[in-house]
Amino acid sequence: MDPDKQDALNSIENSIYRTAFKLQSVQTLCQLDLIDSSLIQQVLLRPSFWEARKHSLSVQQLSQALQELFQKAREENPGQVHPRAPELTLSLLTTMYNSKGTGFLQLMPAAAALITLSGDSPLSKYRALFQLYAENSRGGYDSGPRMTRRVLRKLLTDLQQIPTFVGESRALCPVESATRSCFQGVLSPAIKEEKFLSWVQSEPPILLWLPTCHRLSAAERVTHPARCTLCRTFPITGLRYRCLKCLNFDICQMCFLSGLHSKSHQKSHPVIEHCIQMSAMQNTKLLFRTLRNNLLQGRCRKKEAARRQQLLDQVNPKGVPHHAQARLLKKQLNQYKDKLQAIYTSQEERICRFETRIHKLKTNQDSLWTKLQQIRRDLQARLQPPGPSSSSFQNVGNKVDHSSTEKVPKGGDYLQIKNATEDASTGEPLPKLDEVDRSHRSHTNAEHALRNPESPETTLHSTRAQSQTQKMPQKVISALPSYQEGLKQDIPKMVPAEMSSPALAAVEKKEAGNIKERKDELEEEELQELLSKLMDAFNLETPSGPESSVNMDLYSGAQRVCRAFSALVDQIALPNLK
């Protein structure tokens, strides 16, 4: 493009007209205005290319397709197609969709750019674009080509590369906002061709440059029988603008795009654009409309404010800040979600640790409960009175007392016991030695108890007295064999019969005296030892508590046994001491 012409186009204030004029210059340079959309579909969308529409085309394949396309255009318009048109068009498409220089281009974006810059009407272009991008829904009641949100988003993204090529990407609105405006009020996931055509014909801001470019091309050679009020040019060529507030105020294309105005006409006044010549009836209607706006200025101001607000909404749609706010909220929600997930994970770990501790505590509680039950059974077994009841102990005590009183030896009995001992010294065994020993001990205890009625043995514990009374006869019995052995050792050997009777009598008398002395000494020592053992066995502390009153019968029985043994020992020991 000529730099001077490019600078002139950059001086246009309105971004939509500036973009449209630049694209019109590119269209004219590449001679794409000589090609219609049907020819493009015939060449680029044939079966060989259409099967690979989702894949990439090499630059050589696209160059051959463009050569064929312009060859057919040359046949329809002989002498108008420049030989370098295919080369310039290939360079244009490569710059738009192959910026990385890979050598491959997508078929659908290239075809969409050719259709958009073709010389067809906007309605034909919209239909061709819908057929190019729509997806066929198979089966169902409403089968046919449909366009989903994803497909519409891809179409608008591909078309945005066209104004970006001429450096006018800032004048476009976001793709997401345009997609929401198209699907506003639509409940289905896809739209049909009628809905798509009605939306694009409403001239959305993202595609506003496309119909403007078509109007510029259509009005390029049109003349209007009117004079420009600002530059006084007659006739007006190209677009004609007429003020709806100033009476008979016409503006040419150059003055309008340059932003010129007069004292009576301001930039804020509403104007109407004409790309074709107006008839007399249209001029009359426009005159009455101007008069109404001047007479009803309040109504005119309201309509102008509404029109300007509508234009502002189109240029700066409300969905943009809402969309940004929604994205911010979504980001914050994701952050909160991550935090809550981390908190939930930590709480789960704590719960697992608590459950493990609770399980351990339950196990310890069960083991402690088992131990307590065992201790309880042991205590019950220990607290229960062992052996027979107290009544049986009372009977045993009465029997022992009766037997001790009956078996107390008197003077003659003591001589009998002494004679029995002497008989045992001659070599004969002692008859019923255990019974005699038991009778001696019971008699001795009885006499000792009578002489010492306030002895400490009166407060013996039942269970310990019982055990000591059971062990006492065993001690006495164990001592008797040693006593018998001593007696047997003291028995002298039999003297021979050859000794004389006087000498034998003297010897026997002497030996009998010695034997008697030894026997008395041994008996005294044995009895004293038995007495000391018996006193040690019954030297116990008296228990205190409620059990003492319960076991008094057992204590009394033990006391009687102690008295009987003491009396028996005294009865045996006192004659020897004398």
Swiss-Prot record:
Transmembrane regions: none
Region Disordered, residue ranges: 382-475
InterPro entries cross-referenced by the UniProt entry: EF-hand-dom_pair, EF-hand_dom_typ1, EF-hand_dom_typ2, KCMF1/Dystrophin, Znf_ZZ, Znf_ZZ_sf
UniProt cross-references to PROSITE patterns, sorted A to Z: ZF_ZZ_1 (PS01357), ZF_ZZ_2 (PS50135)
Matches recorded under Pfam families: EF-hand_2, EF-hand_3, ZZ
Residues holding Zn(2+) 2: 243, 246, 265, 269
Zinc finger (ZZ-type) in chain: 223-279
Residue runs in coiled coils: 322-351, 503-537
A GO CC term attached to the entry: plasma membrane
SUPFAM superfamilies in UniProt: EF-hand (SSF47473), RING/U-box (SSF57850)
The keyword Cell membrane belongs to this UniProt entry's keyword annotation: yes
GO biological process: synaptic signaling
Positions that bind Zn(2+) 1: 228, 231, 252, 255
Keywords: Cell membrane, Coiled coil, Membrane, Metal-binding, Zinc, Zinc-finger
Basic and acidic residues bias locations: 399-410, 431-451
Subcellular localization(s) per the UniProt record: Cell membrane
UniProt GO molecular function: zinc ion binding
Polar residues bias: start-end ranges: 455-472
Protein name per the record: Dystrotelin
